[in-house]
C-alpha cells in the first residue's frame, strides 16, 4: 500500500503500525506478548523511522489473555512500557484473545492503564516552583510544616489518581463492617 499511495501521489503522508507476533511451536498458535515479539516491533519501528523515513508506531493493546483482569492488564502494560520508549502510546480498546474478543470490563481497565501511562510519559516540569528548594529550607524540620505550606496546597492534586483502583490500605472485613 506504501508503493501504491506514493505512486498515485508522492506527497501522500504514509505511516506504519508495528504489531508482530511469533508462533508457539508447541501448539502452533500465535503469541503477541512474548519478548521476541516486542523486540521485533521495536526493530520494525526503528527500521521504518531511521532507514525508510516513515513514521511508525507500535500497538501495545493486544494481549494473549482470554479473560479481563490482571493478566491482560499486565501484558498490555509490558507491551506499552517497552514500546513506549520507541513509539507513541495509543489508546486501548478492551480487546482480549489477540483482538478477537471485546470486553467492556477490560476496556475500563485499559482506560485506567492508558491514563497511568499517559501521566508516566508526561514531561516533568523542573523549575524553581516545582523543586521548591527555598520553601524546603525555610520550613526545615518543623512538625507538620510541609502539609500546611502554600506550595503543598497548590500542588497536592498534581498527582494521577486511579478511577478504579483505590489507594487506601487493606482493611479487614471486620474493621470495614465495624465502621
Label for each model-derived stretch:
Residues 105-179:
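Catalytic-core signal marking the mid-to-C-terminal active-site face
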Residues 1-113:
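Glycine-rich anion/phosphate-binding loop at the beta-strand->alpha-helix junction
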Amino acid at each position: 500500500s506504501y508503493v501504491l499511495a506514493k505512486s498515485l501521489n508522492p506527497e501522500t503522508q504514509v505511516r506504519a503500525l508495528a504489531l508482530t507476533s511469533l508462533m508457539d511451536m508447541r501448539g502452533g498458535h500465535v503469541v503477541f506478548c512474548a519478548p521476541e515479539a516486542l523486540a521485533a516491533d521495536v526493530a520494525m519501528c526503528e527500521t521504518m523511522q531511521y532507514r525508510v523515513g516513515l513514521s511508525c508506531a507500535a500497538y501495545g493493546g493486544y494481549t494473549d489473555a482470554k479473560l479481563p483482569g490482571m493478566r491482560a492488564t499486565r501484558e498490555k502494560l509490558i507491551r506499552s512500557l517497552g514500546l513506549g520508549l520507541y513509539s507513541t502510546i495509543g489508546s486501548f480498546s478492551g480487546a482480549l484473545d489477540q483482538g478477537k474478543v471485546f470486553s467492556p470490563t477490560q476496556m475500563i481497565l485499559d482506560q485506567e492503564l492508558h491514563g497511568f501511562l499517559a501521566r508516566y510519559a508526561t514531561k516533568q516540569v523542573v523549575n524553581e516552583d516545582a523543586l521548591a528548594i527555598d520553601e524546603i529550607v525555610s520550613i526545615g524540620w518543623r512538625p507538620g510544616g510541609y502539609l500546611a505550606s502554600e506550595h503543598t496546597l497548590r500542588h497536592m492534586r498534581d498527582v494521577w489518581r486511579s478511577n478504579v483502583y483505590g489507594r487506601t490500605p487493606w482493611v479487614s472485613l471486620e474493621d470495614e463492617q465495624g465502621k
